[in-house]
């Protein structure tokens, strides 16, 4: 008795095209309609693995790790230099979900760069910033600004050690006037010293010492006086 066989279902034409168009593994240049192109690894039709993306509009180049279509892992971002026309590195470090996250180095100019921690493409955590004028800040960051404990070392050697908030000196801190041989210790509000004490500090080694030394002041409880002055200042601020 003859046995009938069911004919195999043929794959529809559009499904075949779609299957063949799915990008997996290493591919050469794949162009987007806007002129951007990518060279590297794919998975399930998205960038995944090692690859290089070039953006036509601004000439930016990213080389590094990708995960499910986004920059994720370690990578380097470069931009064309407006003066030379050549690409220069602007960021090298870690990424997560298409944003700078983890440890990385950002170059703002030939003599200005940041090295430290990032979160959501903003400086956040511990980091060190080298400014073009020669100043150096080292300490905590939040929302792309110094925030927390940190030290600012000026080009002339003077330095501030203490609390920061919103990118400004706020709270208790010490300012070493090493050029004049003096030390100020007190309380700051938005970069302004509001109350504190000034003493001689390394005056004999200072390149430009003050004409006269600060006389020794005999106070029974200098810390208590400073604490009282600070409390009065805070009370005044709250009243405003």
From Swiss-Prot:
One of its GO terms (cellular component) is acrosomal vesicle. Residues 76-100 are annotated as: Interaction with SIRT1. Residues 206-240 are annotated as: Interaction with TP53. MORN repeats lie at residues 38-60, 62-84, 91-113, 114-136, 137-159, 160-182, 184-205. It comes from the Eukaryota. Keywords: Cytoplasmic vesicle, Repeat. It is found in: Cytoplasmic vesicle, Secretory vesicle, Acrosome. Pfam families: MORN. Residues 6-35 are annotated as: Interaction with MDM2. Gene3D superfamilies: Histone H3 K4-specific methyltransferase SET7/9 N-terminal domain. PANTHER family: MORN REPEAT-CONTAINING PROTEIN 3 (PTHR46511:SF1). Assembles a suppression complex (suppresome) by tethering SIRT1 and MDM2 to regulate composite modifications of p53/TP53. Confers both deacetylation-mediated functional inactivation, by SIRT1, and ubiquitination-dependent degradation, by MDM2, of p53/TP53, promoting a proliferative and cell survival behaviors. May play a role in the regulation of spermatogenesis. Interacts with MEIG1. Interacts with TP53, MDM2 and SIRT1; the interactions mediate post-transcriptional modifications of TP53 by MDM2 and SIRT1. This is MORN repeat-containing protein 3. It comes from Macaca fascicularis (Crab-eating macaque). The lineage of its organism: Eukaryota, Metazoa, Chordata, Craniata, Vertebrata. The gene is MORN3.
